From Swiss-Prot:
HAMAP family: MetX_acyltransf
Binding site for substrate: 227, 357
Residue ranges of every copy of the AB hydrolase-1 domain listed in the record: 51-360
Keyword tags: Acyltransferase, Amino-acid biosynthesis, Cytoplasm, Methionine biosynthesis, Transferase
Listed pathway(s): Amino-acid biosynthesis; L-methionine biosynthesis via de novo pathway; O-succinyl-L-homoserine from L-homoserine: step 1/1
Self-association state and partner proteins as the record states: Homodimer.
The name this protein goes by in its record: Homoserine O-succinyltransferase
Length: 385
């Protein structure tokens, strides 16, 4: 917990809830008659409502992107390094909105929420949601907040997919989009990793076909394993080697098959156990499926440049050299399609040892690129503060 709030922090923030009692038809064909979105805001909306920035979260993210909920918090929001006074997403200049996506488990309507039609948790009956569904629900939130357009829509990983979808779906409402450590569609390898994670969850004897709540159980072992698999893909070989190497927890080998002996094993167990206590298993299944399904080029016979034709915004695309989940060549594929579609795009491949997680870590080169882009965004705002 902080003894004092740092001067470059947004400070103490209070989550808010937007309730929608109008139907939302989803891409799967099903409909939610009502739903709520949990969100936070940082900074002040200017008089002509032109300085709003939307933050889109990744797979396990949520609305709490910056600041603290109380002085007892052990750490700030998940992207606090980039949001706040003087930071790339400068809250002295921008009004920032961050939300928990539909289907999430941090306050927005999702599988753990009560289905008003049954009085029980949705569980596996919660409909499949896609990136397109998220963007449409985010547009409803923008309407509720009376935000006609975004100065920028920004996201890393799965969040970058949402930023890209925003630029295609609502071209008149997005002036700039930052697509960081992301991809225009998953590779077969990435889909395979997601399937292994889902299988780990659904194979847990406490899963009960997603109705674990009705059995007062929880598939924590399966979710722990899913997170361990996922976490490996977020790190680079170099960062794991530097942090753990082949270090042992004890001085000597135990020659046991079931003992946790290496430091890297211990770390993965810790990450998996912590995650399994704070995330909903059905939400994890939903989020990985949304990742799998995202492919804006599919409706255009695989031609990504045609999918991008409606977009009118300026893009920033950032990749990281050691990201093997969404490697630089996937960002380059996106950039090439943007160029072919005659879009305005800036691209940076940042040298970082941190793998896919590099988009969360404020290395100097990354921050320089991010600051430069957001500085240009700020200059476009009329009467920018």
């Amino acid at each position: 917990m902080p003894e004092v709030i740092p001067p470059d922090s947004v400070g103490i923030v209070t989550p808010q809830v937007a309730q929608f009692d109008i139907p939302l038809t989803l891409e799967c064909g099903k409909q939610l008659n009502s739903f709520q979105l949990m969100y936070e805001t940082y900074g002040e909306l200017n008089a002509d409502r032109s300085n709003a920035v939307l933050i889109c979260h990744a797979l396990s993210g949520h609305h709490h992107a910056a600041g603290y909920h109380s002085m007892e918090d052990s750490k700030p929001g998940w992207w606090d390094s980039c949001i706040g006074p003087g930071k790339p997403i400068d809250t002295n200049k921008f009004f920032v909105v961050s939300l928990n996506n539909l289907g999430g488990c941090a306050g927005s309507t999702g599988p753990a929420s009560i289905n008003p039609e049954t009085g029980k948790a949705y569980g596996p009956d919660f409909p499949v949601v896609t990136v397109q569904d998220w963007v449409r629900s985010q547009a409803m939130l923008a309407d509720r907040l009376n935000i006609p357009h975004w100065a920028a829509v920004i996201g890393g990983s799965l969040g970058g997919m949402q930023a890209l979808q925003w630029s295609i779906e609502y071209p008149e409402r997005v002036h700039n989009a930052a697509v960081i450590a992301s991809t225009p569609r998953l590779s077969a390898q990435n889909i395979a990793f997601n399937e292994v994670a889902r299988k780990a969850i659904t194979s847990d004897p406490n899963f009960y076909e997603g109705r674990y709540g009705e059995h007062t159980t929880y598939p924590d072992k399966g979710l722990m394993l899913a997170r361990m698999v996922g976490h490996i893909t977020y790190l680079s070989n170099a960062s794991m080697g530097e942090k753990f190497g082949r270090d042992l927890r004890a001085q000597t080998l135990k020659f046991g098959l079931l003992d946790v002996q290496f430091e890297v094993e211990s770390y993965l167990h810790y990450q998996g156990e912590r995650f399994s206590k704070n995330f909903d298993a059905n939400t994890y299944l939903l989020m990985t499926r949304a990742l799998d399904y995202f492919d804006p080029a599919r409706a255009h016979e695989g031609d990504l440049s045609k999918a991008l034709e409606p977009a009118k915004c300026k893009y920033l695309v950032v990749s990281f050299t050691t990201d093997w989940r969404f490697p630089p060549d996937r960002s380059e594929e996106l950039v090439n399609a943007m160029v072919e579609a005659k879009k305005s795009v800036s691209y940076a491949e940042v040298d970082s040892p941190h793998g896919h997680d590099a988009f969360l870590i404020p290395t100097q080169r990354y921050m320089d690129v991010f600051h430069g882009f957001m500085g240009r965004v700020a200059k476009e705002i009329p009467h920018a503060r």
